[in-house]
Regions:
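Conserved alpha-helical substructure of the radical SAM core
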Residues: 1-117
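Conserved radical SAM core fold
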Residues: 20, 74-76, 100-105, 118-136, ...
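Short low-complexity, flexible loop/linker segments enriched in glycine and/or proline
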Residues: 48, 109-113, 134-136, 172-175
Length: 191
């Protein structure tokens, strides 16, 4: 029996545990972990693509596969764009989660050329609150990254992890998100 509905098949992949920030609420402890090599990652992408094809053939199902790439901070991997290209070549839609600090215009353009469907950037509130949580200088750098993404037409979600430090900042964040021109504003679990 075959169905015409394509089932979403998504994987969130933490490509690295490394991060350029040390956020108060983050479970990433800044410890050093051995990362998969580029060849190991490419092999895993191939295996996942083959598995989806086998399931499709065996069960008569259609899939809409995607990877959401995150970390740590995925832009700390020098081979990030090689990885994204390999995912795209295997038919995966691409999404990223980032703190936005390392996203310059060139990176935003490359993401757009790859057809990235969306990037989620974390902002924890207005500047003072954001920098209390994420570190000095991170607010303006994240806003700059968001601006580059918006300029390329990539859909951007601003995400705020709610806590006692920023819980009163929800309404200012709605205004900020609107002013930034982002498509979505999300709120993560209370920590």
């Amino acid at each position: 029996m075959s169905t015409t509905k394509a089932f979403d098949f998504f994987i969130q992949w933490h490509l690295t545990e490394r991060c350029n920030l040390r956020c108060r609420h983050c479970y990433q402890e800044g410890r050093s972990f051995q990362e998969l090599s580029l060849s190991e990652i490419l092999g895993t992408i191939e295996e996942v693509a083959e598995m989806i094809t086998a399931w499709s053939d065996s069960y008569g199902l259609s899939f809409s596969p995607s990877f959401t790439v995150t970390g740590g901070e995925p832009f700390l991997r020098a081979d990030l764009f090689d990885i994204l290209e390999a995912m795209k070549q295997k038919g995966f839609e691409l999404f990223l989660l980032s703190n936005g600090v390392l996203i310059d215009r060139d990176k935003a353009d490359r993401l757009s050329q790859l057809g990235v469907k969306g990037v989620q950037v974390s902002l924890e509130g207005p500047k003072e609150i954001h920098e209390t949580i994420r570190g000095a200088g991170s607010f303006s750098a994240s806003l700059e990254g968001i601006g580059h993404l918006v300029a390329t037409g990539i859909p951007v979600t601003v995400n705020m992890t709610l806590s006692k430090l920023n819980g009163e900042s929800v309404f200012p964040m709605i205004k900020l998100a609107k002013n930034l021109g982002v498509q979505r504003l999300g709120f993560s679990r209370l920590v």
